[in-house]
Each structure stands twice: as structure tokens, then as C-alpha cells.
């Protein structure tokens, strides 16, 4: 039901993660860069533990700004769960959500403590503090706003908002010039029946004070914005960056400013 698209393994190719019904595993499709995808679900530890659950909203996000993309999945059954029905639960469809923490490419699972009939998941930085928060919608239940209070002391970040008057910014790609293949798609869609923050946030590794950012706009033009300070948001306006030849692939231009 749900889908999220990002380059989770930092190989410059977009990957897909899709949620499914109970008795099926959710699926991670690893992009090969030539229009083909391979099923990498079990290789990255995302298969067996998802089987008992019906997944809906899902998004990749770097919750602790360590530079790795973690994964959150909102679950809720569509068929009566017998144990809950016998207990007299009004809507016996409640399931726990799943938080998958990226540990060097393989995901370890943290289960939510509460059960709900989960459906939508939107992400964004609601308090502008540089880490990603989540909003979950539940059928027959209250929405849940989860404010990120993870200790990210010593980890830097940079946030980017694109501005292209008279043109769409959705579908554009933002890449850090200081780290090859660290990129994000500007998107509000995906997940399930949800719309997320259009800004992108990167966790920064290394002892940098500033970084360059490369933007491939939705019309395929490419610009480089130099020496942006860390630990703050920047609004990048189309036409004010340094032009980059449009046939140059993302990942080929990198500059480090300290």
C-alpha cells in the first residue's frame, strides 16, 4: 500500500520500499541505475519481521543525523484480528508500528509500544531544529505527532528549501557536494495518503564548517551553490547558483569547503 523512494545505500541510484498485506513481506527494490531493480529485502534484514503486519505509510529518514537512512513503517490490519475480537476491542485491527534502524546497511528493528490502526505517515521538521519529526494518522483513532528528541550532539546537519518562481521544485534532486552520492529527492508524496515537508535535511559527517550543494532542478538544469553554513536551513533560488553542464551526472561534481 505504501511506497517510499530514496537512494538508501548511497550508490547514486534511487531505490524503492513498498509495504504489503500480512503474510507477505514488505519489499525493498534496490535500483541498478539502468531502469532495473532487484529484490534486496532479505539481504538488508527487512523481510521476515514484516510478515505478520499489514503496512501502510512508510518513509526513509535519517532520524539521528548520522548520514544513514533509517526506515519507518506504519501498520494496521484490514482483517479482524481474532485475539483482539475475543477481548472485545472495538476495532480489532490494531498493530504495532515498526522502526528500522540502519546499521551499516543492515536494518535492526525497534517496535512501537502502542498498537493502533495505522494508515498515514508524513515526515518533516516541525520545530526547525534540524531533525525529522513524524505525523501518523490512525483509522478510528487520534493522529500521533512524534517529535524527534534524539541526542544528536556533535552531529551537524544542513536543511535545504528550493525556490523556483513560476516552476515546480518537486522532483528536483539535491546532493551534498562534500560527499559523493549523498542526495535526496524533493518530494511531498509517497508513503500512503500523506503529504510531507518539501524541505530536505542531511546529516553531515566530517569536520566541516560549510559545504557545497548541487541541485538538479525538475527541468534538468543543474546548479551548484557554494560554501553554505551548517546547522541551519537555506533557501536556494533557481538561477542564483553556478550553472553546471546539464549532461554531467549527479555525483560527478564535488567540492569541500572548510
Where are the predicted features?
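Gly/Ser/Thr/Pro-enriched helix-cap/hinge segments flanking short amphipathic alpha-helices
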Residues: 93-95, 102-258
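Short glycine/acidic-enriched loop and turn motifs that connect beta-strands
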Residues: 23-25, 78-80, 141-142
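Hydrophobic beta-strand segments that make up the repeating blades of beta-propeller
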Residues: 11, 15-20, 59, 71-75, ...
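Beta-propeller blade termini
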Residues: 1-10, 30, 55-65, 119-128
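Short, conserved, GDST-rich strand-edge loop motifs in beta-rich repeat architectures
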Residues: 74-92
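Blade-edge beta-strand/turn elements of extracellular beta-propeller
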Residues: 35-48, 105-113
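Short consensus segments that form the blades of beta-propeller domains
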Residues: 18-20, 48-51, 86-91, 165
